[in-house]
């Protein structure tokens, strides 16, 4: 059996059905050896670890903690300790966290012994005892301004699946450290057991944070290194993380107020020192002595550097040249400088001679008489459309243009349609029983006359005779006599 490094009573906190309670146990710490790994075992009472076989006492539910899986061992503060004067510390592994407690001296010894056994390369030393010699030649004092990067509480958490955690690639278990100015997420190195920072969130960039019985979550702002989003971590110490973060934020606010007050006091003292002093009047500077600065004036008010004056085209109207400006210096006259003078002289000559030709620019714009109206200046609406009586329009420009003949493709004129011959009328017989008198002067209106054409043998003329229809019919001249 391996020899124990340390053993003694320890209070172990267990949670069942939502209720937390402390249970007194007997803990035994074994180091790593050829016969076993470094571990921490718990028993019901003292002496149970020395018994073997079936006669030994029953172990607790938390049978053994392998120190190879230990992540951190840190002292913590609890609201309800198991007994007065007890100090608690937390042992975090890759699977869960264990909250232990003992009296003040034993708790410190347990923390240092566990750290030395679990982390042999950390250089942990036991607390000084009274038997150890005291070196008075060199005294070391702690710097109150020194703030190590690892200062704060560490909590074992498990990342939950959210949009932000998937974007950052968070999966599995991590260490969440609550520092003075930020939250830091740590992970174990691939080759070494050293904690390496993975992500951090400053308190000033956190939008909100909260806790639950089984988790702790916060919402990061868009200026955080991880980007915006909600991060949720599963842990049984959500309330402890929440209180630690709240205390760090309140402390940071207090430091900010103290800094602002110091700045105000410095400003007031500086104003009080300069209040009794007379400020000398500013010395006027010669604008011509020193060149102006590059950005002394805005862009729209920059002055043009002095240079030889040149008159541009249409720079000044006729007669507005200042007197004495060009005396003694023969300056080149601009182009079209006497155009307006010639135009005015022509207008005067035109008015005096009263010429019939319209000169150029004879009258100002807007005063010239209106030109005579053309043929199509006053369009008229078509009226009396009923007078056309649906007659065809004259064909003309609506016909297609023929480029070969350079003329419109006018169809040939149409010949007039022949008039139809009159249809012959049938013979109308008088009604039976009607008698006509011999003394009648003419024929009745309903009597049809038929001419009988006969050809004479001698003269070759046609003789027309009337056949007697009745007794009263008179003779009719032949068509040849007409």
Swiss-Prot record:
<dbReference type="InterPro" id="IPR037751">
    <property type="entry name" value="Dok1/2/3_PTB"/>
</dbReference>
<dbReference type="InterPro" id="IPR001849">
    <property type="entry name" value="PH_domain"/>
</dbReference>
<keyword id="KW-0007">Acetylation</keyword>
<dbReference type="Pfam" id="PF00169">
    <property type="entry name" value="PH"/>
</dbReference>
<feature type="modified residue" description="Phosphoserine">
    <location>
        <position position="269"/>
    </location>
</feature>
<dbReference type="GO" id="GO:0038145">
    <property type="term" value="P:macrophage colony-stimulating factor signaling pathway"/>
</dbReference>
<comment type="subunit">
    <text>Interacts with RasGAP, INPP5D/SHIP1 and ABL1. Interacts directly with phosphorylated ITGB3. Interacts with SRMS (via the SH2 and SH3 domains).</text>
</comment>
<feature type="compositionally biased region" description="Polar residues">
    <location>
        <begin position="432"/>
        <end position="459"/>
    </location>
</feature>
<keyword id="KW-0963">Cytoplasm</keyword>
<dbReference type="InterPro" id="IPR011993">
    <property type="entry name" value="PH-like_dom_sf"/>
</dbReference>
<keyword id="KW-0539">Nucleus</keyword>
<dbReference type="GO" id="GO:0007169">
    <property type="term" value="P:cell surface receptor protein tyrosine kinase signaling pathway"/>
</dbReference>
<dbReference type="InterPro" id="IPR050996">
    <property type="entry name" value="Docking_Protein_DOK"/>
</dbReference>
<feature type="modified residue" description="Phosphotyrosine">
    <location>
        <position position="376"/>
    </location>
</feature>
<feature type="modified residue" description="Phosphotyrosine">
    <location>
        <position position="295"/>
    </location>
</feature>
<dbReference type="GO" id="GO:0005634">
    <property type="term" value="C:nucleus"/>
</dbReference>
<dbReference type="GO" id="GO:0043409">
    <property type="term" value="P:negative regulation of MAPK cascade"/>
</dbReference>
<feature type="modified residue" description="Phosphotyrosine">
    <location>
        <position position="450"/>
    </location>
</feature>
<comment type="similarity">
    <text>Belongs to the DOK family. Type A subfamily.</text>
</comment>
<comment type="function">
    <text>DOK proteins are enzymatically inert adaptor or scaffolding proteins. They provide a docking platform for the assembly of multimolecular signaling complexes. DOK1 appears to be a negative regulator of the insulin signaling pathway. Modulates integrin activation by competing with talin for the same binding site on ITGB3.</text>
</comment>
<dbReference type="GO" id="GO:0035556">
    <property type="term" value="P:intracellular signal transduction"/>
</dbReference>
<feature type="region of interest" description="Disordered">
    <location>
        <begin position="353"/>
        <end position="373"/>
    </location>
</feature>
<dbReference type="Pfam" id="PF02174">
    <property type="entry name" value="IRS"/>
</dbReference>
<feature type="domain" description="IRS-type PTB">
    <location>
        <begin position="151"/>
        <end position="259"/>
    </location>
</feature>
<protein>
    <recommendedName>
        <fullName>Docking protein 1</fullName>
    </recommendedName>
</protein>
<feature type="modified residue" description="Phosphoserine">
    <location>
        <position position="48"/>
    </location>
</feature>
<feature type="modified residue" description="Phosphotyrosine">
    <location>
        <position position="408"/>
    </location>
</feature>
<feature type="compositionally biased region" description="Pro residues">
    <location>
        <begin position="410"/>
        <end position="423"/>
    </location>
</feature>
<feature type="modified residue" description="N-acetylmethionine">
    <location>
        <position position="1"/>
    </location>
</feature>
<feature type="modified residue" description="Phosphotyrosine">
    <location>
        <position position="340"/>
    </location>
</feature>
<feature type="domain" description="PH">
    <location>
        <begin position="4"/>
        <end position="119"/>
    </location>
</feature>
<dbReference type="GO" id="GO:0007265">
    <property type="term" value="P:Ras protein signal transduction"/>
</dbReference>
<feature type="modified residue" description="Phosphotyrosine">
    <location>
        <position position="336"/>
    </location>
</feature>
<feature type="modified residue" description="Phosphotyrosine; by INSR">
    <location>
        <position position="397"/>
    </location>
</feature>
<feature type="modified residue" description="Phosphoserine">
    <location>
        <position position="415"/>
    </location>
</feature>
<dbReference type="InterPro" id="IPR002404">
    <property type="entry name" value="IRS_PTB"/>
</dbReference>
<feature type="modified residue" description="Phosphotyrosine">
    <location>
        <position position="361"/>
    </location>
</feature>
<feature type="region of interest" description="Disordered">
    <location>
        <begin position="269"/>
        <end position="328"/>
    </location>
</feature>
<keyword id="KW-0597">Phosphoprotein</keyword>
<dbReference type="GO" id="GO:0005829">
    <property type="term" value="C:cytosol"/>
</dbReference>
<feature type="modified residue" description="Phosphoserine">
    <location>
        <position position="290"/>
    </location>
</feature>
<feature type="region of interest" description="Disordered">
    <location>
        <begin position="398"/>
        <end position="482"/>
    </location>
</feature>
């Amino acid at each position: 059996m391996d020899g124990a490094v340390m053993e003694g009573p320890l209070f172990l906190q267990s949670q069942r059905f939502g209720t937390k309670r402390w249970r007194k146990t007997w803990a035994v710490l074994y180091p790593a050896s050829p016969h076993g790994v470094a571990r921490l075992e718990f028993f019901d009472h003292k002496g149970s670890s020395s018994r073997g076989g079936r006669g030994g006492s029953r172990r607790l539910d938390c049978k053994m903690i392998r120190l190879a899986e230990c992540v951190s061992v840190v002292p913590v503060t609890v609201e309800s300790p198991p007994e007065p004067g007890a100090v608690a510390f937390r042992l975090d592994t890759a699977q869960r966290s264990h909250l232990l407690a003992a009296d003040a001296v034993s708790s410190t010894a347990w923390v240092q012994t566990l750290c030395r056994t679990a982390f042999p390369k950390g250089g942990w030393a036991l607390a000084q005892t009274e038997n150890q010699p005291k070196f008075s030649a060199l005294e070391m004092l702690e710097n109150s301004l020194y703030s190590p990067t690892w200062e704060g509480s560490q909590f074992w958490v498990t990342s939950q699946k959210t949009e932000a955690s998937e974007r950052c690639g968070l999966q599995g278990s991590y260490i969440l450290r609550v520092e003075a100015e930020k939250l830091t997420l740590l992970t174990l190195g691939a080759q070494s057991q050293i904690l390496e920072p993975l992500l951090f969130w400053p308190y000033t960039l956190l939008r909100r944070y909260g806790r639950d019985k089984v988790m702790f979550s916060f919402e990061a702002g868009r200026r955080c290194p991880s980007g915006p989003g909600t991060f949720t971590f599963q842990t049984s110490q959500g309330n402890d993380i929440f209180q630690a973060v709240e205390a760090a934020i309140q402390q940071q606010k207090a430091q900010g107020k103290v800094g602002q007050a110091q700045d105000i006091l410095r400003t007031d003292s500086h104003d009080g020192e300069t209040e009794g002093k007379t400020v000398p009047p500013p010395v006027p500077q010669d604008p011509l002595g020193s060149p102006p600065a590059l950005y002394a004036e805005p862009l729209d008010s920059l002055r043009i550097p002095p240079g030889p004056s040149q008159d541009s085209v249409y720079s000044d109207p006729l007669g507005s040249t200042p007197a004495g400006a060009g005396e003694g210096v023969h300056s080149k006259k601009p182009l079209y400088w006497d155009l307006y003078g010639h135009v005015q002289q022509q207008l005067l000559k035109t008015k005096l001679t009263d010429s019939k030709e319209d000169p150029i620019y004879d009258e100002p714009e807007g005063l010239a008489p209106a030109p005579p109206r053309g043929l199509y200046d006053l369009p008229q609406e078509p009226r009396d459309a009923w007078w056309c009586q649906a007659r065809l329009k004259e064909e003309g420009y609506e016909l297609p243009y023929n480029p070969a003949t350079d003329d419109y493709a006018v169809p040939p004129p149409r010949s007039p349609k022949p008039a139809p011959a009159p249809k012959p009328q049938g013979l109308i017989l008088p009604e039976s029983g009607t008698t006509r008198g011999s003394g009648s002067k003419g024929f009745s209106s309903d009597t049809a006359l038929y001419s009988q054409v006969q050809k004479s043998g001698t003269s070759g003329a046609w003789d027309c005779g009337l056949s007697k229809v009745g007794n009263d019919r008179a003779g009719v001249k032949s068509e040849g006599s007409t």
